[in-house]
A protein has these predicted regions:
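Short hydrophobic/aromatic-rich beta-strand segments that constitute the beta-sheet cores
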Residues: 34, 54-56, 94
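Structural motif
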Residues: 51-53, 73, 81, 89-91
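A short, N-terminal "cap"/entry segment at the start of jelly-roll beta-barrel domains
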Residues: 1-24, 32-35, 66, 70, ...
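Glycine- and acidic-residue-biased ligand/ion/polar-headgroup-sensing regions
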Residues: 40-58
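Double-stranded beta-helix
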Residues: 2-5, 83-113
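Short acidic-glycine-tyrosine-enriched beta hairpin
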Residues: 58-79
Length: 113
């Protein structure tokens, strides 16, 4: 997997599967991503170094803002508009996953001994 340049810095996929993705991101001081949402993916940010602000838009267009430092984690639910801003040069893990339906089993018969 290869690094990809972004306007705000670099992203490097570490793991990509149908159910989960993990990217290492390096964001330049002052760098920010677009305001966006994911239809079905949950998006988490775990800061390794630096300072990353996560903005999340809630009901009535109100914006909640959380500043993350090394060791901090923030989780953005699927469908929620969000954006990140680096207040220092920042390295973080960006983790995506989809909720699994734990009742998605159809049994043809019953197990036994």
């Amino acid at each position: 997997m290869t690094k990809e340049g972004k306007v705000w810095g670099l992203t490097e996929p570490l793991l990509q599967s149908p159910a989960v993705e993990i990217h290492r991101i390096k964001v330049e001081m002052g760098g920010y991503c677009s305001q966006h949402k994911h239809q079905s993916k949950i998006n988490a940010f775990y800061v390794i170094s630096g300072e990353l602000e996560i903005q999340r838009w809630k009901d009535y267009g109100l914006c909640d803002s959380t500043r993350l430092f090394a060791g901090d984690l923030s989780i953005v639910p699927a469908g929620e508009m969000h954006k990140f801003i680096a207040h220092q040069e920042t390295e973080a893990l960006e983790i995506y996953w989809a909720e699994l339906n734990h009742t998605d089993i159809v049994r043809e018969n019953v197990g036994g001994i």
